[in-house]
Protein backbone atom coordinates (compact mmCIF):
# COMPACT_ATOMS: atom_id res chain seq x y z
CA UNK A 1 0.00 0.00 0.00
CA UNK A 2 2.92 2.35 0.46
CA UNK A 3 3.53 2.30 -3.31
CA UNK A 4 -0.13 3.04 -3.94
CA UNK A 5 0.00 5.93 -1.50
CA UNK A 6 3.05 7.31 -3.30
CA UNK A 7 1.39 6.98 -6.70
CA UNK A 8 -1.72 8.81 -5.55
CA UNK A 9 0.39 11.53 -3.93
CA UNK A 10 2.12 12.06 -7.28
CA UNK A 11 -1.25 12.11 -9.01
CA UNK A 12 -2.49 14.86 -6.74
CA UNK A 13 0.67 16.83 -7.46
CA UNK A 14 0.18 16.64 -11.24
CA UNK A 15 -2.43 19.38 -11.40
CA UNK A 16 -0.74 22.76 -11.06
CA UNK A 17 -3.87 24.79 -11.66
CA UNK A 18 -5.69 25.95 -8.51
CA UNK A 19 -9.08 25.77 -10.23
CA UNK A 20 -11.80 23.44 -9.11
CA UNK A 21 -11.85 21.28 -12.26
CA UNK A 22 -8.30 20.15 -11.61
CA UNK A 23 -9.04 19.47 -7.96
CA UNK A 24 -12.03 17.28 -8.76
CA UNK A 25 -10.07 15.41 -11.42
CA UNK A 26 -7.28 14.56 -9.00
CA UNK A 27 -9.61 13.65 -6.16
CA UNK A 28 -11.77 11.40 -8.29
CA UNK A 29 -8.79 9.73 -9.90
CA UNK A 30 -7.17 9.15 -6.52
CA UNK A 31 -10.33 7.56 -5.21
CA UNK A 32 -10.61 5.33 -8.26
CA UNK A 33 -7.05 4.11 -7.80
CA UNK A 34 -7.55 3.43 -4.12
CA UNK A 35 -10.73 1.47 -4.72
CA UNK A 36 -9.26 -0.52 -7.59
CA UNK A 37 -6.21 -1.55 -5.60
CA UNK A 38 -8.31 -2.51 -2.60
CA UNK A 39 -10.18 -4.83 -4.91
CA UNK A 40 -6.89 -6.61 -5.61
CA UNK A 41 -6.10 -8.97 -2.70
CA UNK A 42 -2.36 -9.06 -3.42
CA UNK A 43 -2.18 -5.31 -2.82
CA UNK A 44 -3.94 -5.34 0.55
CA UNK A 45 -1.96 -5.47 3.77
CA UNK A 46 -3.59 -7.08 6.85
CA UNK A 47 -5.50 -4.38 8.71
CA UNK A 48 -4.54 -5.87 12.07
CA UNK A 49 -0.93 -4.83 11.41
CA UNK A 50 -1.91 -1.19 10.97
CA UNK A 51 -2.77 1.49 13.44
CA UNK A 52 -5.63 3.96 13.68
CA UNK A 53 -4.46 7.53 13.15
CA UNK A 54 -6.29 10.46 14.75
CA UNK A 55 -4.79 13.77 13.74
CA UNK A 56 -5.66 17.37 12.88
CA UNK A 57 -4.49 18.56 9.47
CA UNK A 58 -3.77 22.23 10.07
CA UNK A 59 -6.94 23.72 8.57
CA UNK A 60 -9.11 25.91 10.77
CA UNK A 61 -12.58 27.27 10.18
CA UNK A 62 -15.41 29.24 11.75
CA UNK A 63 -19.13 29.28 11.06
CA UNK A 64 -18.77 32.83 9.74
CA UNK A 65 -15.64 32.77 7.60
CA UNK A 66 -15.64 29.28 6.09
CA UNK A 67 -18.60 27.11 7.17
CA UNK A 68 -18.29 24.94 4.06
CA UNK A 69 -14.98 23.53 5.34
CA UNK A 70 -16.74 21.11 7.71
CA UNK A 71 -18.96 19.85 4.89
CA UNK A 72 -15.89 19.36 2.69
CA UNK A 73 -14.18 17.31 5.40
CA UNK A 74 -17.30 15.17 5.88
CA UNK A 75 -17.68 14.62 2.15
CA UNK A 76 -14.09 13.60 1.52
CA UNK A 77 -13.76 11.47 4.66
CA UNK A 78 -16.78 9.42 3.59
CA UNK A 79 -15.05 8.55 0.33
CA UNK A 80 -11.66 7.75 1.84
CA UNK A 81 -12.75 5.28 4.54
CA UNK A 82 -12.21 7.82 7.35
CA UNK A 83 -14.26 9.87 9.79
CA UNK A 84 -13.87 13.63 10.27
CA UNK A 85 -13.82 15.50 13.55
CA UNK A 86 -13.27 19.02 14.84
CA UNK A 87 -10.97 20.15 17.60
CA UNK A 88 -11.45 23.45 19.40
CA UNK A 89 -10.57 25.18 22.62
CA UNK A 90 -13.54 25.62 24.95
CA UNK A 91 -15.19 28.97 24.28
CA UNK A 92 -13.40 29.51 20.97
CA UNK A 93 -15.28 29.96 17.70
CA UNK A 94 -12.37 28.51 15.73
CA UNK A 95 -12.25 24.77 15.01
CA UNK A 96 -9.46 22.71 13.47
CA UNK A 97 -10.30 19.91 11.06
CA UNK A 98 -9.05 16.40 11.78
CA UNK A 99 -9.57 12.87 10.52
CA UNK A 100 -9.56 9.37 12.01
CA UNK A 101 -8.63 6.42 9.84
CA UNK A 102 -6.29 3.50 9.25
CA UNK A 103 -2.79 4.73 8.48
CA UNK A 104 -2.88 4.42 4.67
CA UNK A 105 -6.47 5.63 4.42
CA UNK A 106 -5.65 8.62 6.61
CA UNK A 107 -2.73 9.63 4.39
CA UNK A 108 -4.92 9.61 1.29
CA UNK A 109 -7.80 11.37 3.01
CA UNK A 110 -5.48 14.09 4.29
CA UNK A 111 -3.91 14.59 0.86
CA UNK A 112 -7.32 14.80 -0.82
CA UNK A 113 -8.78 17.20 1.73
CA UNK A 114 -5.81 19.57 1.78
CA UNK A 115 -5.68 19.61 -2.01
CA UNK A 116 -9.39 20.38 -2.33
CA UNK A 117 -9.25 22.98 0.44
CA UNK A 118 -6.27 24.72 -1.15
CA UNK A 119 -8.09 24.91 -4.47
CA UNK A 120 -11.13 26.54 -2.88
CA UNK A 121 -8.96 28.86 -0.81
CA UNK A 122 -7.03 29.92 -3.91
CA UNK A 123 -10.20 30.86 -5.76
CA UNK A 124 -11.49 32.70 -2.69
CA UNK A 125 -8.31 34.78 -2.64
CA UNK A 126 -9.04 35.77 -6.22
CA UNK A 127 -12.61 36.69 -5.32
CA UNK A 128 -11.44 38.94 -2.50
CA UNK A 129 -9.32 41.01 -4.91
CA UNK A 130 -12.44 42.32 -6.65
CA UNK A 131 -13.00 46.03 -6.12
CA UNK A 132 -16.20 47.80 -5.21
CA UNK A 133 -17.67 45.22 -2.84
CA UNK A 134 -17.98 45.49 0.96
CA UNK A 135 -16.26 42.83 3.05
CA UNK A 136 -19.56 41.13 3.90
CA UNK A 137 -20.46 40.69 0.23
CA UNK A 138 -17.03 39.30 -0.62
CA UNK A 139 -17.35 36.84 2.25
CA UNK A 140 -20.73 35.71 0.94
CA UNK A 141 -19.22 35.24 -2.52
CA UNK A 142 -16.41 33.11 -1.11
CA UNK A 143 -18.67 30.98 1.06
CA UNK A 144 -21.14 30.53 -1.79
CA UNK A 145 -18.30 29.36 -4.00
CA UNK A 146 -17.15 26.96 -1.27
CA UNK A 147 -20.62 25.44 -0.93
CA UNK A 148 -20.89 25.16 -4.72
CA UNK A 149 -17.53 23.42 -4.92
CA UNK A 150 -18.59 20.88 -2.30
CA UNK A 151 -21.89 20.16 -3.99
CA UNK A 152 -20.24 19.80 -7.37
CA UNK A 153 -17.72 17.37 -5.93
CA UNK A 154 -20.52 15.47 -4.21
CA UNK A 155 -22.34 15.13 -7.53
CA UNK A 156 -19.16 13.83 -9.15
CA UNK A 157 -18.70 11.26 -6.37
CA UNK A 158 -22.32 10.13 -6.75
CA UNK A 159 -21.83 9.65 -10.48
CA UNK A 160 -18.73 7.61 -9.79
CA UNK A 161 -20.62 5.43 -7.31
CA UNK A 162 -23.36 4.76 -9.85
CA UNK A 163 -20.78 3.68 -12.43
CA UNK A 164 -18.87 1.45 -9.98
CA UNK A 165 -21.38 0.05 -7.53
CA UNK A 166 -19.00 -2.79 -6.65
CA UNK A 167 -16.74 -0.27 -4.89
CA UNK A 168 -19.31 -0.04 -2.13
CA UNK A 169 -18.12 -3.43 -0.89
CA UNK A 170 -14.62 -2.15 -0.14
CA UNK A 171 -14.99 1.59 0.40
CA UNK A 172 -16.16 1.24 3.98
CA UNK A 173 -14.87 2.62 7.26
CA UNK A 174 -13.01 -0.14 9.18
CA UNK A 175 -14.54 -1.22 12.49
CA UNK A 176 -11.39 -0.18 14.36
CA UNK A 177 -11.99 3.38 13.18
CA UNK A 178 -15.65 3.30 14.15
CA UNK A 179 -14.64 2.05 17.60
CA UNK A 180 -12.19 4.95 18.00
CA UNK A 181 -14.86 7.44 16.95
CA UNK A 182 -17.36 6.01 19.44
CA UNK A 183 -14.97 6.85 22.27
CA UNK A 184 -14.71 10.51 21.28
CA UNK A 185 -16.78 13.26 22.81
CA UNK A 186 -19.43 14.30 20.33
CA UNK A 187 -20.46 17.85 19.59
CA UNK A 188 -23.16 19.24 17.36
CA UNK A 189 -22.28 21.45 14.42
CA UNK A 190 -24.87 22.70 11.98
CA UNK A 191 -23.35 22.86 8.50
CA UNK A 192 -26.32 24.15 6.52
CA UNK A 193 -25.44 26.85 3.98
CA UNK A 194 -26.01 30.44 5.01
CA UNK A 195 -29.28 32.10 4.06
CA UNK A 196 -27.52 34.71 1.90
CA UNK A 197 -26.19 32.71 -1.04
CA UNK A 198 -24.68 34.34 -4.10
CA UNK A 199 -26.24 32.16 -6.77
CA UNK A 200 -23.68 33.07 -9.40
CA UNK A 201 -20.72 31.82 -7.36
CA UNK A 202 -22.59 28.83 -5.94
CA UNK A 203 -23.65 27.77 -9.43
CA UNK A 204 -20.10 28.17 -10.72
CA UNK A 205 -18.70 25.38 -8.56
CA UNK A 206 -21.77 23.17 -8.83
CA UNK A 207 -21.94 23.36 -12.62
CA UNK A 208 -18.23 22.57 -12.94
CA UNK A 209 -18.69 19.48 -10.80
CA UNK A 210 -21.74 18.30 -12.74
CA UNK A 211 -20.12 18.72 -16.16
CA UNK A 212 -16.69 17.41 -15.32
CA UNK A 213 -15.45 14.16 -16.91
CA UNK A 214 -13.41 12.53 -14.18
CA UNK A 215 -11.20 10.54 -16.57
CA UNK A 216 -10.62 13.28 -19.12
CA UNK A 217 -7.67 15.14 -17.60
CA UNK A 218 -5.53 13.09 -15.27
CA UNK A 219 -4.41 9.52 -15.81
CA UNK A 220 -1.87 7.81 -13.54
CA UNK A 221 1.55 7.01 -14.91
CA UNK A 222 2.50 3.37 -15.16
What is each residue range found by the language model?
Residues 39-222:
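Extended, helix-rich structural scaffolds rather than catalytic motifs
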